[in-house]
């Protein structure tokens, strides 16, 4: 099913991206939601187009979106399959004029992602993964497989631009050497690890499930891994609050047992938060 509608989903994200980019000059106009996160007109219009299109493409598949997430757990806990979307991931980055925002669409089956599509409207780049296939990057209409890379001597750790909970990482790396840290918004962090630009991404606070699902599936399809702090894979639609636990994402799995490296150790060693 997904391979048959992939081109339509890619076209959808391009159209949504144009909506988002048309609002960049007015990105400072936003309101705050009940969970104290910002929402813009771009979020709302993007959500409407994605929801309407998915309902036409897959009318029997329910949809859970950041901008329409008030579906009680009692109603959705029986879902075996559903779309999980963030129509504008990185709203704060968008508001602040950063290019680090994206559109994130995942299909969840039996509590795990089974399809992921992320589009960067600013860079006009797609990342996607079909079920049980390798992850693909599309830039300039040219698709190619991507894969994580073995870290160089200076490992590259990427964290959220607005993260206030990096103290555990700083404490953990205090005795380590040969690493650099970078700040980047949205689920694009998963994609850039998937193509070998960064090596690791620790998230020591909880975040919404629509923030992780597509990125997790894409990173895993490029050779990476994402685990919670108990070293278990992330699961979906088990919680009323739709929040993923703290996690750690790594690109190069073959090096997971080498605890001498700076950042890879946080994938294999327990970390107190």
For each predicted feature, which ranges?
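Conserved beta-loop-beta connector loops within the AMP-binding
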Residues: 141-153
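Short gly/ser/thr-rich secondary-structure transition/capping motifs
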Residues: 64-68, 140-142, 230-232
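Short helix-loop capping/hinge motifs at secondary-structure junctions, enriched
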Residues: 134-144, 254-259
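Residue-level signal for inorganic ion chemistry
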Residues: 20-23, 43, 54, 91, ...
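N-terminal subdomain of lithium-sensitive/metallo-dependent phosphomonoesterases centered on the IMPase/IPPase/PAP
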Residues: 1-88, 171-175, 270-273
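DPxDG-like acidic metal-binding loop motif
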Residues: 73-136
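Generic detector of well-ordered alpha-helical packing
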Residues: 44, 67, 87-90, 94, ...
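An extended, acidic
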Residues: 150-273
């Amino acid at each position: 099913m997904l391979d048959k509608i992939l081109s339509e989903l890619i076209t959808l994200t391009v159209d949504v991206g144009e909506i988002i980019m048309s609002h960049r000059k007015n990105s400072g106009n936003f309101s705050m939601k009940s969970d104290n996160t910002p929402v813009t007109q771009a979020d709302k219009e993007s959500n409407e187009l994605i929801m309407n299109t998915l309902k036409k493409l897959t009318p029997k598949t329910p949809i859970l979106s950041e901008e329409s997430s008030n579906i009680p757990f009692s109603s959705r806990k029986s879902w075996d399959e559903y779309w999980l979307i963030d129509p504008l991931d990185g709203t704060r980055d968008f508001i602040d004029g950063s290019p680090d925002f994206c559109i994130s669409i995942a299909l969840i089956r039996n509590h795990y992602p089974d399809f992921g599509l992320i589009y960067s409207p600013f860079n006009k780049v797609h990342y996607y993964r079909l079920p049980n296939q390798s992850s693909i990057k599309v830039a300039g209409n040219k698709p190619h497989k991507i894969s994580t890379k073995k870290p160089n001597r200076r490992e590259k750790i990427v964290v959220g631009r607005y993260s206030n909970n990096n103290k555990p990482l700083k404490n953990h790396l205090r005795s380590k050497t040969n690493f650099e840290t970078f700040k980047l918004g949205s689920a694009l962090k998963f994609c850039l690890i998937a193509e070998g630009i960064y090596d690791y991404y620790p998230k020591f606070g909880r975040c919404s499930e629509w923030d992780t699902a597509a990125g997790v599936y894409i990173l895993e399809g490029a050779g990476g891994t994402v685990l919670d702090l108990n070293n278990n894979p992330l699961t979906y639609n088990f919680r009323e609050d739709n929040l993923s636990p703290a996690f750690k994402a790594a690109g190069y799995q073959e090096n997971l047992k080498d605890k001498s490296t700076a950042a890879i150790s946080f994938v294999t060693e327990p970390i107190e938060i």
